[in-house]
Amino acid sequence: MKKISNMKPLLVSAMLFLSVTGKAQSHGNRLSVGVGALYERGFDVTLAVEHETKNHNAWEYFANGYVKWAKDESARHVTKESFWNNYRTWGLGVAYKPCVVRSRNKYGSLRIGASAGSDTHEVVGWANLGYEHNYVLRHGWQLYWQVKTDLCIKGEDLFRTGIVLGIKLPTGSR
């Protein structure tokens, strides 16, 4: 009987430890901004709201802007006019991001999504596929890099692929 009474504090501690679930870096909402360079001669900006679900899986709702620059034939280099007025698109979309790699203060996710928008003349659509790696900082801030590929439907480009760097800020709501 004495052995059981000595084990009670240990059993109660073990039960409390097992009943408390870990919530660190999980189930948060974030605002993110990313900028990147895409092949061929492209510049990309993405603003997004990310809602994290279980196990670092997440849904991302985003707005994207893209500019494809060209050389000005008369000046023989890129000018302000040839940068901003060559080809540009904007789009709105959603992406599912299942977590595929996790370790201390970092995790990686596939990014699978679709978006639609315009190239200022007609409706354009994209299938989005990529990989995103996140580094968790203090107070919920995150830095990330992303390798992305967009398959364009009815656009000037068929494929757009490149690297994006960005930051995610916690919204405070869980």
Cite the ranges covered by each PLM segment:
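Short glycine/proline- and aromatic-enriched beta-strand/turn motifs that initiate or cap beta-hairpins
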Residues: 22-71, 162, 168-174
